[in-house]
């Protein structure tokens, strides 16, 4: 796992943008709505080929209401994530973050490949892969709505 921090003065990160926009590289994350929105806004890019473990989990793990990353790591990897550092002050430079904060960041993503693989198998088994793919397309639309100032659900009555 890599921990990155773009230059806050101009947010130029051309090498990262190349990766984010590369359709051949899958970007895996958990609850990507705000991460993708922020990265696209600040880096002026269009992120391609994302896999959102929370959306996949909600579509294929219908036997539970627990779809947090902590729950997925426990079920698929047999590990307990310590989420206490999640509410830390993250508005610091990388050099100011503690070793515990840096470890927390890497722990948050190190299990995502296995979780993605297992969720993909479940989506196929449950015949929900196409529904997942449509949901990801809509996620991109939802992000565009967020970026345009429509923070409320426009489909809500």
Protein language model annotation of sequence segments:
Residues 1-122:
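Conserved DEDDh/DEDDy metal-dependent 3′-5′ exonuclease domain
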Residues 91, 98-157:
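Mixed-charge, glycine-rich, non-catalytic linkers/tails in nucleic-acid processing enzymes
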